[in-house]
Amino acid sequence: MAIYHMQAKVVSRGSGRSAVAASAYMSCSRMYNDYDGIQHDYTRKHGLIYQEVMLPPMAPSEWNDREQLWNAVEETEKTKDSRLAREFVVALPVELDKDSNISLLQDFIKKNFVDMGMCAD
């Protein structure tokens, strides 16, 4: 039986977080943050099953590169307490296979975020 769990967090400069660092961590990748000059390297982190950047139609195509996307967010939001991103942790049903879970998440993200003009990573 599937167990429901969903946790929502805000990535905020006020709490000392960075959208570039959060994206690098979640995608197990290396990214340079133009805002503070820090290189975030999480290439040794394991456990990534799938990654995708989803953009609304009006978003620039260069934002398909997550490093450019999150650096653009960091550049746009200037204040010390800026809310840069939202992070969601969702439990997926173990009864479904990997492809079904990916499709389930893609549909959820598209309907609830991308169709409302937000970028999703």
Residue map of PLM features:
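N-terminal nicking endonuclease/strand-transfer module with a His-rich metal-binding environment
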Residues: 1-121
